[in-house]
């Protein structure tokens, strides 16, 4: 007991010595020099809102970037709060520097305030020169543990061993570095050592940290704070027992440790195992000052080279290059002629090529020299033999007289491969270089550790500071994150052109988590009707048991086993099934010869059963309740002999049904038996069928203050969100995902009807905006993706991308909608199929839980059939509605406002040339009159002979005549209505390729078959003639509405016309026409037939007329102004739009093609002779 207490005291002492006293210090600059080597545990920055990266130096001003476990640089966010926002870290440093994370960050004139929590670290940096020491485990406080943590901070240029422990009972823990890669060998007593390795080019003489972390069933290896590898221990044991004596910086000399380095040469600043500082326990004579001379080096960038004069052999250097095929070393003569080339091929293998004899040799062994690690190169010539060594192995050689010629003529060595070079025998600081070269340091940035390529993509370092991903089929993008595969069958059917394919069923590859780690799944998508007659999309997952399984002979219960293979993992099964509201699977069990299902033998136990995806036994069949030992027939009491299953009756029978319990599905295995030589069973399992993907349920937001929210942490390399949404407002917030302090966020919103994706981080903002508007009330598919190199936005397949460098924020809380949130305008519309970084957001389930007012499940807006009248379209705003009356002759908020005019006899109303954009096949007019034998409208084509007339005959009946301009005349009459009965009648007529129809008051009165395509060419309209007297409204010519928008429709009129609603009940017709304007005003009205028409609504309530005296006075006051402006208005408003051509030469237009010229016959003032319009202008 006393011994255990001593061990605990020593352990506590070692921990206290390691940690030391901690305190907070602050610096008003971006650089903070500490008082010696300290352990930094917390960081915070105070100042204007910005973002900073962190670099630390242990010694020699060698600064390294601090990174997170996922490989991203650590980002410190400064705040204006007086309370520090701490970021927890754990590293050693003598100096800490921060610098803006953004290249063009806003400069803070005051400078940021850097706050650190530092702890005393009294252990000196120890230098090892092929020397080592031992530590007694009990003296260091090391005990057997189920969780272990080994941390080593080191720098070296060579391979070596850090820690060595091999216990007598077989437990092993060895940490070493070999060719720049850290290797850890461990065993917890199973006598089967496991290995884990990570890192690359760590023998570069810079400070690095390796951390081996064991947590019972998990082992991780991190390099410089980045998790690079992880595995699971083998065997049954999980506790690590150390040898009584552990070795630091070496190992004992024995014959059992082959493949393990014997010593270590370099420096170690920290070596801790389970918080025991083993470096502090080193002997005093080992504490040498860390002095590591830095060899001369330089970095060759693309298209650069270095020329090294030949002085002596061997010619030796170390290199770390980018995997680009081309020459590594070229031997030149004095005339710059190539003697020998050492080149790198596409597989990063070396070849030797002689320019003299054209001899080519491949390296043997074939060493990958472009893997990003440091390699040694040595060229030597001995007599008639030239040898090239890579990493100490002779891989290339050349023999014969050719070697003599090379040695005699050799003048220069040319290095041209892009990468880093260093040498202790060659002065690389003074070599002649061509191109972009960085001297004195290696600027090679490892971009493929950890692998940034997702979904099985391979990373290749393409430049000193860049990489490319070789993506697998179906994925693309910088990091192989982007995929065009649908998330579900519902999404696939929604895609244009797939609805018809789904009727028969189609094999589809779906990716549930989008660009996430989960692999795609092959399913069958089919549109079919369920048992209650509702059409829906079914997702069908097939297995490999295509035919029924037959079992016979003597078999014990469950003796015959068969595993059903679906081609997916258990994780994929869980994600697939759990995402649906309902899944089912057909099951059939046929028994013959007395075989039983649930009551076998004296124990009356099941003879056959199945296994679920969670490896549980399913002890029921068909629709029977889970684990009930019943079959489907027991539910309705139809089993034979009142048993629980038909196959428990002892007779030949069948139990079948559809298993509807998702927790039991799919059936992954069959355990069959209970048969004899005279009995048999036959089992059939159908495919898994699922319906109603929960995330595809639409959710309607009818209150812009409503919201749905949830928590999800984002700390990945790539952000993405995909959803389906429809809306009608031009300004809205769809989805936001923000940090806890609301200073950093992703925001997807609508601005001016366009989709906008915005990333805000550290006071910097990046936006991407769609090209088109989408506030049309229709579903649109949106996908937005962002990473450190840029982002792109895809709406309905139309993609827009932005290339820029920025940092993705760390966010936690997502919100859909909510006007009350900061910077949010709320959401009103329908949203579904939301996937946020591979996670399905089933908003319908959130809506059920939160019961938020203004949020409802389903696609149900405000619009109802009776809200908009007279053919107006209801535009659903989801928090309200508006009526679109633009395609009707009506107006007002509900399309009930009439636009009409009282037309006295002698008036003229016409459209001299209709805008071509308004021409169509359907037209409309409403009249109220007592006139007979009058024309309702006349129409013709400017450049054709076709005509159309509609009149009221002597009996008040409707009569129409048409001529197609070539052969056929049409004439019809309808006697069903008396159009002269002083009642408003609504007349509409439409033509098509094969029919012409006329309707009066909604009743079809005339139908003519034939070719009526000529009807679309009518572009000259005359309404009513001089005999007509009454009220007219609802005029529609194609897509134009002359009474509603006279300027747009190019309406001209003349006469004593009064505009207002029709019919006008406030005054009689006599009162409406009984006014005597000034003669000048009358002539002005006639002359300015194309002046602006202003339409006023006349109230239906009766009002007293304004006295004629007051009206006359007003008219006299305005007459002078009207006379002055009439000529200018006439000129500007009377000419139709277009281009006029003169017909004087007859080259452009033929006057005979028009029935009526645009300029009517006039009389010359000089000779009173008529001047014909055919000699003037025609519109072409």
Curated annotation (Swiss-Prot):
Belongs to the neurexin family. It comes from Caenorhabditis elegans. Residues 1130-1180 are cytoplasmic. Disruption phenotype: RNAi-mediated knockdown results in abherrent inx-3-positive gap junction formation along the adjoining membranes of EA and EP endodermal precursor cells at the 16-24 cell stage of embryogenesis, and in adult pharyngeal muscles. The inx-3-positive gap junctions are increased in number, are randomly positioned at irregular intervals on either the EA and EP cells and, although they are along the membrane, they are not on the membrane. Disulfide bonds join 267-290, 448-459, 453-469, 471-480, 863-874, 868-883, 885-895. Residues 1142-1180 are annotated as: Disordered. Keywords: Cell junction, Cell membrane, Disulfide bond, EGF-like domain, Gap junction, Glycoprotein, Membrane, Receptor, Repeat, Signal, Transmembrane, Transmembrane helix. Residues 1-20 form the signal peptide. Residues 444-481, 859-896 form the EGF-like domain. Residues 21-1108 are extracellular. Required for gap junction formation, playing a role in anchoring the cytoskeletal component F-actin to the membrane of adjacent cells and thus facilitating the formation of gap junction channels in embryonic cells, muscle cells and neuronal cells. Plays a role in maintaining gap junction activity to promote pharyngeal muscle contraction. Interacts (via the intracellular domain) with F-actin; the interaction is required for anchoring F-actin at the membrane for gap junction formation. Highly expressed in pharyngeal g1 and g2 gland cells, pharyngeal muscle cells and the unilateral GABAergic RIS interneuron (at protein level). Expressed in pm5 pharyngeal muscle cells and the nerve ring. Pfam families: EGF (PF00008), Laminin_G_2 (PF02210). This is Neurexin like receptor 1. Residues 124-290, 695-863 form the Laminin G-like domain. Glycans are attached at residues 229, 302, 336, 355, 436, 522, 636, 933, 949, 978, 997, 1011, 1052. It comes from the Eukaryota. The chain crosses the membrane at residues 1109-1129.
């Amino acid at each position: 007991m006393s011994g255990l207490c001593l061990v605990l005291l020593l352990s506590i002492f070692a921990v206290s010595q390691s940690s030391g006293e901690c305190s907070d210090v602050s610096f008003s600059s971006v650089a903070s020099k500490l008082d010696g080597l300290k352990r930094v545990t917390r960081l915070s920055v105070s100042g204007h809102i910005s973002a900073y990266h962190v670099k630390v130096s242990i010694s020699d001003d060698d600064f390294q970037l601090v990174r997170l476990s996922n490989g991203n640089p650590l980002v410190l966010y400064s705040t204006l709060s007086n309370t520090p926002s701490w970021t927890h870290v754990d590293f050693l440093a003598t100096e800490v520097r921060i610098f803006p994370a953004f290249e063009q960050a806003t400069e803070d004139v005051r400078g940021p305030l850097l706050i650190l929590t530092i702890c005393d670290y009294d252990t000196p940096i120890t230098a090892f020169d092929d020397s080592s020491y031992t530590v007694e485990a009990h003296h260091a406080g090391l005990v057997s543990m189920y969780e272990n943590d080994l941390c080593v901070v080191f720098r070296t240029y060579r391979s070596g061993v850090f820690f060595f422990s091999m216990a007598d009972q077989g437990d092993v823990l060895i940490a070493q570095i070999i060719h720049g890669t850290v290797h850890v060998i461990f065993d917890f007593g199973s006598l089967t050592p496991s290995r884990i390795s990570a890192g690359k080019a760590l023998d570069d003489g810079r400070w690095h940290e390796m951390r081996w972390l064991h947590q019972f069933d998990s082992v991780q290896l991190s390099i410089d704070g980045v998790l690079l590898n992880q595995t699971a221990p083998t065997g049954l044991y999980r506790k690590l027992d150390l040898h009584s004596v552990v070795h630091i910086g070496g190992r004992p000399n024995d014959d059992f440790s082959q493949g393990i380095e014997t010593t270590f040469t370099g420096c170690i600043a920290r070596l801790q195992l389970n918080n025991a500082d083993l470096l502090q326990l080193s002997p005093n004579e080992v504490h040498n000052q860390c002095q590591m001379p830095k060899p001369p080096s330089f970095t060759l960038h693309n298209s650069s080279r270095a020329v090294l004069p030949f002085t002596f052999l061997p010619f030796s250097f170390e290199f770390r290059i980018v995997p680009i095929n081309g020459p590594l070393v070229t031997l030149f003569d004095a005339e710059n002629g190539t003697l020998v080339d050492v080149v790198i091929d596409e597989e990063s293998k070396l070849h030797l090529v002689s320019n003299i004899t054209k001899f080519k040799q491949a390296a043997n062994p074939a060493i990958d020299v472009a893997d990003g690690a440091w390699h040694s190169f040595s060229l030597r010539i001995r007599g008639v033999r030239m040898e090239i060594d890579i990493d100490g192995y002779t891989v290339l050689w050349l023999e014969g007289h050719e070697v003599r010629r090379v040695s005699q003529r050799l003048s220069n060595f040319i290095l041209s491969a892009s990468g880093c070079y260093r040498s202790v025998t060659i002065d690389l600081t003074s070599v002649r270089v061509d191109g972009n070269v960085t001297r004195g340091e290696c600027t090679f940035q490892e971009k493929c550790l950890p692998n940034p390529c997702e979904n099985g993509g391979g990373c290749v370092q393409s430049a000193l500071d860049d990489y490319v991903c070789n993506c697998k089929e179906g994925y693309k993008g910088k990091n192989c994150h982007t995929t065009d595969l649908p998330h579900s069958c519902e999404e696939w059917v929604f895609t244009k052109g797939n609805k018809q394919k789904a009727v028969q069923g189609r094999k589809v590859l779906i990716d549930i988590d989008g660009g996430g780690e989960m692999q795609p799944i092959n399913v069958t998508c089919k549109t079919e009707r369920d048992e209650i007659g509702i059409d829906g999309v079914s997702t069908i997952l097939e297995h490999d048991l295509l035919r029924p399984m037959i079992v016979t002979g003597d078999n014990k219960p469950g003796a015959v086993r068969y595993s059903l293979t679906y081609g997916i993992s258990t994780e994929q099964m869980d994600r697939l099934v759990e995402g649906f509201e309902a899944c089912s699977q057909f099951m059939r069990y046929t028994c013959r010869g007395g075989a039983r299902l649930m009551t076998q033998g004296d124990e009356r136990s099941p003879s056959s059963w199945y296994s679920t995806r969670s490896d549980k036994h399913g002890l029921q069949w068909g629709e029977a309740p889970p684990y009930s030992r019943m079959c489907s027939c027991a539910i309705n009491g139809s089993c034979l002999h009142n048993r629980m299953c038909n196959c428990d009756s002892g007779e030949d029978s069948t139990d079948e049904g559809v298993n509807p319990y998702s927790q039991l599905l799919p059936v992954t295995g069959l355990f069959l038996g209970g048969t004899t030589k005279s009995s048999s069973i036959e089992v059939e399992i159908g495919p898994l069928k699922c319906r109603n993907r929960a995330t595809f349920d639409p959710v309607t937001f009818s209150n812009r203050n409503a919201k749905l929210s949830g928590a999800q942490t984002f700390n990945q390399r790539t952000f993405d969100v995909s959803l389906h949404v429809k809306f009608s407002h031009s300004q809205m917030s769809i989805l936001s995902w923000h940090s806890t302090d609301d200073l950093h966020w992703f925001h997807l919103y609508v601005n001016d009807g366009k989709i906008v994706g915005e990333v805000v981080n550290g006071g910097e903002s990046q936006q991407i905006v769609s090209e088109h508007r989408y506030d049309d009330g229709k579903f649109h598919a949106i996908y937005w993706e962002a990473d450190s190199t840029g982002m792109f936005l895809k709406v309905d397949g139309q993609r827009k991308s932005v290339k820029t460098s920025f940092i993705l924020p760390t966010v936690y809380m997502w919100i859909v909608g909510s006007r009350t949130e900061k910077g949010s305008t709320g959401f009103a519309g329908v949203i579904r199929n939301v996937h946020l970084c591979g996670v399905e957001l089933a908003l319908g389930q959130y809506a059920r839980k939160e019961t938020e007012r203004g949020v409802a499940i389903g696609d149900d807006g405000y619009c109802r059939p009776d809200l908009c009248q007279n053919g107006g379209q209801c535009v659903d705003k989801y928090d309200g509605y508006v009526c679109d009356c633009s395609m009707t002759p009506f107006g007002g908020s509900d399309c009930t406002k009439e636009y009409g005019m009282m037309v006295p006899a002698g008036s003229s109303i016409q459209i001299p040339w209709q805008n071509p954009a308004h021409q169509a096949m359907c037209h409309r007019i409403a009249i109220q009159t007592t006139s007979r034998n009058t024309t309702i409208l006349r129409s013709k084509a400017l450049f054709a002979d076709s005509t159309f007339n509609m009149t009221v005959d002597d009996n008040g009946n409707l009569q129409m005549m048409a001529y197609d301009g070539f052969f056929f005349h049409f004439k019809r009459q309808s006697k069903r209505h008396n159009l002269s009965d002083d009642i408003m009648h609504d007349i509409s007529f439409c033509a098509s390729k094969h029919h012409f129809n006329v309707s009066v008051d909604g009743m079809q009165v005339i139908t003519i078959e034939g070719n009526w395509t000529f009807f679309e060419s009518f572009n000259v309209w005359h309404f009513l003639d001089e005999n007509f007297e009454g009220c007219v409204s609802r005029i529609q010519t194609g897509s134009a509405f002359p009474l509603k928008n006279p300027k747009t429709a190019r309406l001209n009129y003349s006469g004593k016309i009064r505009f207002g609603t029709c019919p006008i009940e406030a005054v009689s017709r006599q009162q409406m026409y009984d006014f005597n304007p000034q003669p000048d005003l009358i002539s002005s009205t006639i002359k300015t037939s194309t002046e602006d028409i202003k339409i006023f609504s006349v109230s239906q309530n009766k009002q007293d007329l304004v006295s004629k005296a007051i009206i006359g006075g007003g008219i006299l006051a305005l007459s002078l102004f009207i006379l002055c402006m009439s000529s200018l208005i006439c000129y500007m408003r009377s000419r139709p739009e277009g281009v006029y051509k003169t017909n004087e030469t007859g080259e452009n237009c033929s006057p005979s093609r028009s029935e009526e010229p645009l300029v009517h016959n006039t009389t010359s003032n000089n000779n009173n002779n008529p001047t014909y319009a055919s000699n003037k202008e025609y519109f072409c």
